[in-house]
């Protein structure tokens, strides 16, 4: 059922469909589902906010973390905080009422904040892949990665994210309640006159999903080849082989993390867009959104907590200046000094 600035995934044959800005949507799913949604958002908030805020705090506290190669990781933490503060809190609050209680303006603000955080995060992963490829594979001779390059990378993520999130605010597509009608996102559902949703969805799918995906696969593919070549040149070195395995594991985790986060959401959004008019339940879009929102937790785990330097500094901060595991960390890392080119992207 399509209305002004909303689309409810239910045929209004019985006349029970109401505006998701004004009335509870308990006719869509069991009211218990809204309680589950609220509990899940609360879970993401109590885990996502501390770990991402701690990343920023630890970086301010430890000067050795403030290096150009870590700028993009901090940007990733900021993006996740955008999602937590601007998106998860409002979704949790709305789910407690069973509909989007913040109105049309609130929908625009929530949709913009959550999508902005998601897009910054997505492009940060692509820029991170480029940076690691450039540093390890050295496609440009005599190139030295510096602060200006890091700032350019961070600026690119914000530019691309804003290029995706601002247009719906000014008339190219729009933000509407989606799924269980407690959070807002891009309108994949309708061909509302005057909004040019078709062209925007095509632009978003190819420029803001396929392009980062191609970048990530290319850069990490080249990086793996470089690491394997380095390991093949030192076959007798056990430390080099171990470093190769760790880099391979890290790359696999990065690619899987990206796909788990964005592939379900992008695939379902594309299906809805290409099958407009077909019947689908509210959970059809809600569940893939869970995967995308969960990135605020597993992104910092994969990209930050698995980074030895960040991990040690976090532990030191949490234990008031002492690292009770320092002996174990040193013992585990002392065998990795030979494979410098591989360990430069190693997670531990």
Curated annotation (Swiss-Prot):
A motif ('Ionic lock' involved in activated form stabilization) lies at residues 131-133. Pfam families: 7tm_1, Rhodopsin_N. One of its GO terms (cellular component) is plasma membrane. It comes from Neoniphon argenteus. One of its GO terms (molecular function) is G protein-coupled photoreceptor activity. This is Rhodopsin. Belongs to the G-protein coupled receptor 1 family. Opsin subfamily. Residues 1-33, 94-107, 171-199, 272-283 are extracellular. Residues 327-348 are annotated as: Disordered. The record marks 110 as: Plays an important role in the conformation switch to the active conformation. It comes from the Eukaryota. InterPro entries: GPCR_opsins (IPR050125), GPCR_Rhodpsn (IPR000276), GPCR_Rhodpsn_7TM (IPR017452), Opsin (IPR001760), Retinal_BS (IPR027430), Rhodopsin (IPR000732), Rhodopsin_N (IPR019477). Photoreceptor required for image-forming vision at low light intensity. While most salt water fish species use retinal as chromophore, most freshwater fish use 3-dehydroretinal, or a mixture of retinal and 3-dehydroretinal. Light-induced isomerization of 11-cis to all-trans retinal triggers a conformational change that activates signaling via G-proteins. Subsequent receptor phosphorylation mediates displacement of the bound G-protein alpha subunit by arrestin and terminates signaling. Glycans are attached at residues 12, 197. GO terms for biological process: absorption of visible light; G protein-coupled opsin signaling pathway; visual perception. It is a multi-pass membrane protein. Residues 59-70, 131-149, 222-249, 306-348 are cytoplasmic. The gene is rho. A lipid is attached at residue 320 (S-palmitoyl cysteine).
């Amino acid at each position: 059922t399509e209305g002004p600035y909303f689309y409810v995934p239910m045929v209004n044959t019985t006349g029970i469909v109401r505006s998701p800005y004004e009335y509870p949507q308990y006719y869509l799913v069991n009211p218990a589902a809204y309680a589950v949604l609220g509990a899940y958002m609360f879970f993401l908030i109590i885990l996502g906010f501390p770990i991402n805020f701690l990343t920023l705090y630890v970086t301010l506290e430890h000067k050795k973390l403030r290096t150009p190669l870590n700028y993009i990781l901090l940007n990733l933490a900021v993006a996740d905080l955008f999602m937590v503060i601007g998106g998860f809190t409002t979704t949790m609050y709305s789910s407690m009422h069973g509909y989007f209680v913040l109105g049309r303006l609130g929908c625009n603000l929530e949709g913009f904040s959550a999508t902005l955080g998601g897009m910054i995060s997505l492009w940060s992963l692509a820029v991170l892949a480029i940076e690691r490829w450039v540093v390890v594979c050295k496609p440009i001779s005599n190139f030295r990665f510096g602060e200006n390059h890091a700032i350019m990378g961070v600026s690119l993520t914000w530019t691309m994210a804003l290029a995706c999130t601002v247009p719906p605010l000014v008339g190219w597509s729009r933000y509407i309640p989606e799924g269980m009608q407690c959070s807002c996102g891009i309108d994949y559902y309708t061909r509302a006159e005057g909004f040019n949703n078709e062209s925007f969805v095509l632009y978003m799918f190819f420029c803001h999903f396929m392009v980062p995906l191609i970048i990530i696969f290319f850069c990490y593919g080249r990086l793996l080849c470089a690491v394997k070549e380095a390991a093949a040149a030192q076959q007798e070195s056990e430390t080099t082989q171990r470093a190769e395995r760790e880099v391979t594991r890290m790359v696999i985790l990065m690619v899987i993390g990206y796909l788990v986060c964005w592939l379900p959401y992008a695939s379902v959004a594309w299906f809805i867009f290409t099958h407009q008019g077909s019947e689908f339940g509210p959970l059809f879009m809600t569940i893939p959104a869970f995967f995308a929102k969960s990135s605020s937790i597993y992104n910092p785990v994969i990209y930050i907590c698995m980074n030895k330097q960040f991990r040690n500094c976090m532990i030191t901060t949490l234990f008031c200046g002492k690292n009770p595991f320092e002996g174990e960390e040193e013992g585990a890392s002392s065998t990795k000094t030979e494979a410098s080119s591989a360990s430069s992207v190693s997670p531990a």
